Curated annotation (Swiss-Prot):
Expressed by the venom duct. This is Conotoxin SIVB. The modification 4-hydroxyproline is found at P55, P60, P61, P69, P72, P75. Residues 1-21 form the signal peptide. GO terms for cellular component: extracellular region. Is only found in C.striatus specimens collected from the Hawaiian Islands. It is found in: Secreted. Glycans are attached at S45. It comes from Conus striatus (Striated cone).
Length: 80
């Protein structure tokens, strides 16, 4: 096989996998509709679960007032 033939085969394989892996709009709308309906239940909101809105959370009160003490940096190249 020559280089031109190998390149043509490569392009056809890439094109075929792209066409096969791209879902059609009709099929994807039906599957994603159920996910979008319950998305609010699955994704917790940081604002509604912290700072006094929900007392059962593990959020420290200093986060609400931005008064948490800063942790000392560990020595290393990334902290320079």
């Amino acid at each position: 096989m020559g280089m031109r033939m190998m390149f043509t085969v490569f392009l056809s394989v890439v094109l075929a996998t792209t066409v096969v892996s791209t879902p059609s709009d009709r099929a994807s709308d039906g599957r994603n509709a159920a996910v979008h309906e319950r998305q609010k239940e699955l994704v917790p909101s940081v604002i509604t679960t912290c700072c006094g809105y929900d007392p059962g959370t593990m959020c420290p009160p200093c986060r609400c007032t931005n008064s948490c003490p800063t942790k000392p940096k560990k020595p290393g190249r990334r902290n320079d």
